[in-house]
Amino acid sequence: MDNKFNFTKSCYIFFYLNPYIRISSNIYTLILMNKEFEQISLKPGFMKHNGGLLFKSISENEYQFKTTITENHLNAAGIVHGGYISAVVDAGAGTAAHRASNGSPCVTISLELKFISAIKLGQELVGITKIQKKTKSMVFLTCELKSSNKIVATASGVWKILKLSGAGPGG
């Protein structure tokens, strides 16, 4: 019996049979797919101040984020303020652009948002972001926000991939 460690076989078992890791067919880039949400608003800033944002990767081109609505997010009419919805989309979709760009910092170039329905106190707001196209310097994406399994807003945007280091997601 041969007791030698078989590196190739071990890599195959770990990378190809592990459901949390995907390998792109032409590029040997590993992308970790999270089954659970993670808090992305860890640094002091706007999103952390406003309750944070949970995020997870679904696939190489699809990401999900969520938050629960509190009194701080409401406007005078008792529904979620449009500015807060915009900030949530910007942070969630921006994190998707960051992840799709192999961790490079990204900044919003344009963001178009359409408000469809009101969101109320205590509801969970869930966003699904899909990368439509990625170039060396830009990420084009769309986003759909849902609450109680109903679409409440849609968005599309463009993010610039910066050539900086040290920046993180979730502002």
Q: PLM features: what roles do these ranges have?
A:
Residues 1-10:
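Extreme N-terminal basic, low-complexity initiation segments
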Residues 12-13, 17-21, 27-171:
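Terminal targeting signals and extreme-terminal segments of soluble enzymes
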